[in-house]
């Protein structure tokens, strides 16, 4: 019986699913917004919320746990140096899932996953234009 097992299998083996979620977590932490399908976005939210909660308390044990899950040193540094302090006062709900229609090839429902309170990308473009 599968009572209490709420994990979506996403039609993948366990190793493929783990690698896919790890790659999506790394992309979301690096770019702070990604585009994916709705079921993948909902599973990604579960994993990323826990990682961002780890990032709020920068202990050595938490850094090792985050590195064990991400396997990317730059993203672990960003998680504890940038994202952790940004969300220190927020008690959860670090991600936002916006539905954005259907994919052209197979009509799969697509979603835009982003971190809330992220810097506006248009503001960064304006700053670089002023310097040039």
From Swiss-Prot:
InterPro entries: Ribosomal_bL17, Ribosomal_bL17_CS, Ribosomal_bL17_sf. The keyword Acyltransferase does not apply. Keywords: Ribonucleoprotein, Ribosomal protein. The keyword Transmembrane does not apply. GO terms for cellular component: cytosolic large ribosomal subunit. GO terms for biological process: translation. GO terms for molecular function: structural constituent of ribosome. Gene3D superfamilies: Ribosomal protein L17. PROSITE patterns: RIBOSOMAL_L17. Part of the 50S ribosomal subunit. Contacts protein L32. Belongs to the bacterial ribosomal protein bL17 family. HAMAP family: Ribosomal_bL17. This is Large ribosomal subunit protein bL17. It comes from Leptothrix cholodnii (strain ATCC 51168 / LMG 8142 / SP-6) (Leptothrix discophora (strain SP-6)). The lineage of its organism: Bacteria, Pseudomonadati, Pseudomonadota, Betaproteobacteria, Burkholderiales.
